[in-house]
Swiss-Prot record:
It holds the Pfam family Hfq. RNA chaperone that binds small regulatory RNA (sRNAs) and mRNAs to facilitate mRNA translational regulation in response to envelope stress, environmental stress and changes in metabolite concentrations. Also binds with high specificity to tRNAs. This is RNA-binding protein Hfq. The keyword RNA-binding applies. One of its GO terms (cellular component) is cytosol. PANTHER family: RNA-BINDING PROTEIN HFQ. Residues 9-69 form the Sm domain. SUPFAM superfamilies: Sm-like ribonucleoproteins. One of its GO terms (biological process) is regulation of translation, ncRNA-mediated.
């Protein structure tokens, strides 16, 4: 059985590991710019200017990283012929 691939967790984890500057857009329209420090099923911690903010995921609209991140490992991609 193939393990499921959670794109949200993988995307956030890559942003965290690569310390990519990211703009977090909230549903209210407010923007938070910083680096993802941690996340779980319900929250994301963003560090900006030496301060940490805990943001509830239900309040987030969009993550906009300053650059693209790798979304898969080349060895992990399954190739099918046909």
């Amino acid at each position: 059985m193939k393990a499921s691939y959670n794109i949200q967790d993988h995307f956030l984890n890559q942003l965290r590991k690569e310390m990519v500057p990211t703009t977090v857009f909230l549903v209210s329209g407010f923007q938070i710019r910083g680096v993802i420090k941690s996340f779980d099923n319900f929250t994301v911690i963003v560090e900006s200017e030496g301060r940490q903010q805990l943001i509830y995921k239900h309040a987030i609209s969009t993550f906009s990283p300053a650059r693209n991140v790798t979304l898969y490992e080349p060895d992990a991609v399954e190739v099918t012929e046909g």
